Amino acid sequence: VTRFEFRLHPVGPDVLCGLIVFPFEQAKSVITQFARFTETMPDELNVWMVARKAPPLPFLAEEIHGKEIVVLAVCYAGDPDEGMKHVEALRQFGSAYGEHIGVQPYVDWQQVFDPLLTPGSRNYWKSHNFSELEEGLIDTVIEYANALPSPQCEIFVATIGGETGRTKP
């Protein structure tokens, strides 16, 4: 690509957002449901799946810290009441360790993960694009997420939906 055009759209100032944290033992079910859910979610909703060891989040019991988890990071940029209907569907993916979901300024949500990416920690990101999460890929994600070399490592699947998912190359 040598050039592309994009159009900005207003967001917020507030969005419905947060995390739902599931035990890693439920990874296959949660990730499979996530994959199917993202195929039909509305443009106002974005959900990322993260597999990692639990950081010391204040809404998780202390005995969960350091355990393998699957996280759904949710952001709904529309009417919060409508967004809660989608959050409720995500809650049904399994039996969560905990969650922290609510309305907050978009600029706060945009920075919420910054403490996990501290300067000097040699952050390295590598990406691949997939049109869908097939069962074999889900199994591979689970296999490697179960063997991450440090508590700072994670595997995440970021959805790029909306118009980008509907536009043909």
Which ranges hold each PLM region?
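Soluble FAD-dependent oxygen oxidases
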Residues: 1-169
